[in-house]
Amino acid sequence: DDCYPWEILPKIKDFILKLGPTLPKDKFDEIEKNVWVAKSAVVAKTASITGPCIIDEDTEVRHCAFIRGNALVGKHCVVGNSTELKNVILFNNVQVPHYNYVGDSILGYKSHMGAGSITSNVKSDKKLVVVKSENEAIETGLKKFGAMLGDNVEVGCGSVLNPGTVIGPNSNIYPLSSVRGIVPAGSIYKHAGEVVIKQVEE
């Protein structure tokens, strides 16, 4: 059977609850029930964190960040001012630094969301999310599913990633874009209907 990355989303909570107690106590503090924060992480006093949550080493959680639970945040990440996370995995070196909402999503290594860009995780008609490409529609069985970002994805400021968006590695999304469906790896998403493959520099 095919296996898709969004199948992980309903399992994030249980994974964190299983992993958290095994983290080395010389490197992590359980600052409150089911919230494990690396000693080398920097968390602003004004940040709000609800468990279960793991914040890994050398990550920065800035002023008024809001982590609503089921968040696995990797090493060297930035969770910025007024950014909200819920049921997410952020791989190492991810940056969501300014006014971002990331819900029911997975962000790959070194991906970056520009200021004000968000993942929209529920369809307006409240139906189950379907991932659509040019050739097929994949039923996810999920009511809440934001986006899957590959490694080194750059999302421009003010963009909306609609429910069920999948962006391949090394792709760029123009600012103020409304993105849906599958964006191939190595692409530049300019607007709906205009997605170009990056030119390889020799």
Indicate residue ranges for each PLM-predicted region:
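Terminal amphipathic alpha-helical/low-complexity segments used for targeting or macromolecular assembly
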Residues: D1-N34, N170, L176, A185-S187, ...
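Short, conserved secondary-structure segments in the cores of folded domains
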Residues: K27, I31-K33, G51, H63, ...
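Short, functionally important structural connectors and interaction interfaces within domains
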Residues: K27-D29, A41, A65, C77, ...
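Glycine-rich active-site/cofactor-binding loop and its immediate structural neighborhood
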Residues: V37-S82
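A generic structural signal for ordered secondary structure
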Residues: I54, E84, K190-A192
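Glycine-rich hexapeptide-repeat left-handed beta-helix
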Residues: L90-N92, P97-E202
